[in-house]
Amino acid sequence: MNSGAMRIHSKGHFQGGIQVKNEKNRPSLKSLKTDNRPEKSKCKPLWEKVFYLDLPSVTISEKLQKDIKDLGGRVEEFLSKDISYLVSNKKEAKYAQTLGQVSPVPSPESAYTAETTSPHPSHDGSSFKSPDRVCLSRGKLLAEKAVKDHDFIPANSILSNALTWGVKILHIDDIRYYIEQKKKELCSLKKSSTSVRDSGKKAGTTIQKARTGRLKKPFLKVEDVNRSYRPFYLQLTSVPSINYATHKPCSPFDIEKPSSVQKQAQPKPRPNTDGDKCGGTPVQLQLKEKRKKGYCECCLQKYEDLETHLLSEKHKNFAQSNQYQVVDDIVSKLVFDFVEYERDTPKKKRIKYSVGSFSSVSANVLKNTEPKEKLQLEPIFQKDMVESNGQLPEEIFQCEDIQCEDIQKPEQRLVLASEPMSYSSTGLKGRDEKAASMLNASEPDIKQKFTQLPPCKNEQEGILDVSEHKLIINRNDLEQRVGDSVGVPRSCVQVSHLSPENSLPQPKLTADTTHFSAKDLQEKDLHFVFGHDSDLVTLNTSKEQLTVKAGTPSCGPQQPNECDTENTDNLPCGKIQRKVRLLLGQKKKNVDPSAELDKKRTEFLPMCEDRTCGSPVQSLLDLFQTSGEKSDFLGFTSYTENSGLCDVLDVWEDENSSSLLSTFFSSPSASTFIGF
């Protein structure tokens, strides 16, 4: 800076009370810029002003610097004499201007007072003498000296240098307030000024500000003719083709959508249900497994495919090393007692059994009032043997003599069992006529014998189970059933006595028991029908209390030759069995025990085979009576759908029903039928 350069200091005050210091005065530039000053002074109040910021905070200084630049000011990084204003946040900056030119250099007055107060007198002998001072106390003198010697602004600081150079000092609070006021004035000026401008100028400014670029082919662009709206465009990957075969609601350009749907649907085929059977995994799962990436901690490397990594040499060497041989030896000694988790075990379909798939028939009747005879027909099973010549084995009914141990024992038991035999249909055709004649032979005599049985009027409790080979009450279908049936039951019946002490108590009814009260059954008959397909077993019970109970005991596949009551209870179970418990309540009758014993003995005498059957009820009764100790039994008759239940119910009279039920429900034992 030239020392000869002249500076013009304007002592006028700037707006807001801030004194303005003009820089170098250049008349040539002033004459050119006189026209632009009023416009810029309104929009930029800090135009041509230079500021120096003495602030320790960087964020505050940056924010203040931005505001100064928005108002037209300029910020310098170095303090010099060209600076217009110094902004500081120190306390001294608030009263630096009010104190005036406070300098750390001693003033002439202080120097003069120091000379006069010095203890040494002057030796020059001049006539000039200091005026007499008023004697002050020692405290006042110390206070005055402290005020004079105190420096409000330390020497060689930024503030002291600014004062010596004539730079205006402003506190940060003052400059902030000034900037806020100017911003409000500018906002009011913008609102009051002409806000409406020419649309062409606005459009020109927007077009200049908008980003421009070239569109890549193929593209679709729509422009406005008046250019009042900006154009809109769409860049395409391929040239679209119009499909005229589409319907009205659909767009003619919607050709790529079904292709995209097909691409998405291709990796989503449903896995085949036979995939597990063939031993292969579905295709979809294989694709997902290949895409999976991972990191092998053993090899310390990433892999793209798990299977390929496991087959690599590096992983094999690690897996086949002998480092973990000790651990393998310990693990091999452990007992394998892991339990398969439910989700790992394959779900098995539950096999549904019908009611007549496999069952047995047994009936127990308990008489508590009058002493009766006790009967037991025990099953004697025989092995399934098929002769090589195709002949059927003989069916045996063995009936032992009835023995009366005690007249006062009121319990009876009847157990019927049959063992199925499977044969070819050709082996049964030859025995059709013979079986029909033998089974229909002794029916009239059976009717006479069974009608003599005393009716069961006492309270009774029975268990009814339906066997795989059902009891059928149709005479006409018996002849057709023998030739067409695949399996012929092979059974034997044994009658013996049981004492009331050996009888087991009746079990309590479980939660799955259905109760039928006598009140509900007073006005109608309840029919129990058990069987598979068209095979039916019908029981007509009127005015009786019934309890139906379901159970699941069954028998094993192989049958022994002979079995007693104790042996049959220990047979293995493997098939479903249904139980029906009947609680029969009847009126009590006092019958002579000796008369009933004579009737019982005459009922089970051997009957002739030459007699013919008279009704479907007697055909059923014929199954339980034999003409001798050994006779042929060729199976049960089938009661088909064509022959209704009405024929059976008409013949089933009150006397026959009571006598038949006494035969079925004559055992007090609570033991269930084991199975065939």
From Swiss-Prot:
Keywords: Cell cycle, DNA replication, Metal-binding, Nucleus, Phosphoprotein, Repeat, Zinc, Zinc-finger. One of its GO terms (biological process) is positive regulation of nuclear cell cycle DNA replication. Zn(2+) binds at C296, C299, H309, H315. GO terms for molecular function: nucleic acid binding; protein serine/threonine kinase activator activity; zinc ion binding. The keyword Zinc applies. Its main location: nucleus. The modification Phosphoserine is found at S312, S354, S359, S418, S627, S669, S671. The keyword Protein biosynthesis does not apply. Residues 113-129 have a biased composition (Polar residues). Residues 1-40, 98-132, 253-281 are annotated as: Disordered. Phosphorylation increases its interaction with PSIP1. A motif (Integrase domain-binding motif 2 (IBM2)) lies at residues 657-676. This is Protein DBF4 homolog A. It comes from Cricetulus griseus. The gene is DBF4.
